Structures are given as structure tokens and as C-alpha cells.
Amino acid sequence: MTDIQSLLNKQDFIELSARERAKALLDKGTFRELLDPFARVMSPWLIKQNIVPQADDGVVIAKGTIQEQPVVLISIEGLFQGGSLGEVGGAKIAGALKLAVEDNLKGIPTAAILLLETGGVRLQEANLGLAAIAEIQAAIVNLRQYQPVIAVVAGSVGCFGGMSIAVGLCSYIVMTQEGRLGLNGPQVIEQEAGVQEYNAKDRPFIWSITGGNQRFASGLADAYVDDDRQKIREQVIDYLTQGVPQQHRSSNYSFYLAKLQQVDTAEQITPAQVQALYQGEQA
């Protein structure tokens, strides 16, 4: 097959909505949504602030199978409030992960796939969102004992804030060139540090720090794949087949502490230096 034909046959992943992304990864005909839009479970706080809510609060929860393995698939809609998490959306995610734990305790090997496009906590529901993300993180740590918890950060919103910490707790992290992963978003850093220090409009600069390629080269992501539905699905299947890793990245904190102690904070570290610093992390 020629390169041109491959390009024509390619089906982008990041152009899909949250619900379409979930369906693209699951085995055909197995998609079953929990608390779908017709359940009308939406944020009670947005209306009070004259913000139009969404019937699913921007979070899609589905059960199904991938290669006949039971999975719960969690997909955040980045087009609604920047993918921010509030009380309802966060509770849906935490609840879905807890249900997966219950499945495993009953002998049903349910894994979790997180498709994340989020700026973190929803400012209009700050404290409630923070509490929800704490529950999500605890649920991930609990579930990953039994089955892989796989995070996919494909773009174009990226994954920031408290949910970026949740990603670091996952068994495996899959990213694309368009995906970004970082604790603080570019606009937040620019506001605090100034445009001379961190220009949020400089796309090459931003992606050189938080982009998928940089995160993978630094050992902070496990896979770097093309923006293609089939390739992302194949990578997820590969990690489901591998099962629970021998050591989760977050359990290897001593490695990162030792590396960070080598950094001279008097000088700005470059993306290339970050890659060199973490060389051998995946060995």
C-alpha cells in the first residue's frame, strides 16, 4: 500500500467527539452507555452562574469489550467547558472506576480506558471538582492492582491540572503528536510567570515542553502513536494483553527524586536536557 493510499485510508481520532472516541475503541456492538444524556444528570451549579449545562456534564461512561475483554471506557468531551471537571462529571468517573473494582472482586476482569481532554478542575465548581479528582485518583490506584488502567491523551485540549496527576497514576499512558500533558496549562503559567518566560501562543515552544513526543522521549509516556483510530486501538489492545505492569511509574518515585536533585534550578532546563535526564527510565 502506497503512502498516499495510507493517508487516504487514515481515520483521525482527535476529530471525534467523546462518545465517538469511545465507540471507536470498543468492539463493534458492545457499547453500552451508563448515565447517558437522557438520564439528564447535569451540573446544578452552572445554571446558577448563567452557564448552559450539558446533559451528560461532558463525560461519557460506557461499558463494553475490547478484544472480548470487559472494559469501562471513560471519555471527556473537550468541547464542553474545556473538558473541565465538576461535581457530576467527576462523580461519574470515580463511580465507574469503583464499579470496575467491584467487577474484579466478583471475578470479572474489567479494565479501564480513560480518554482525557481536560483542563482540570472546573473553576465554577472548584472545591467539588477537587474532591472528585481526589476520588478518581484513589479509585485508579485501587483498580490498577487488578487490571490495567490505560490513559489516552490524543488532543487537542490536552490533559492538565489534577487530572494530569491522575494520568501519572495510570498503568500505561498513550499520547499522540497533538496531545499535551502537564500540571499547569500554558495560559496559567504565562499569567504567573509572564510572557517573556512562557509564551502560551508559541505552539512549537509549548509542544516542545508538554507535547506527546517530548513526554514519550522523556519516559513520561509509554507510547507515542499516530492520530489514527486503528493504531490507538491496537496500542490499547497491546497494553490490555500485557496486563498489570511489574512497577507503576508513580511507585518509582525514588528514581525521579534522584534525577530532580541533579537539576540546577538556577538555570532554565531545556526539553533536550529533560530527555537526557530521564534516559534509561524505561529500561
Feature locations, PLM:
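Amphipathic alpha-helical segments at domain termini/boundaries
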Residues: M1-L34, Q191-A283
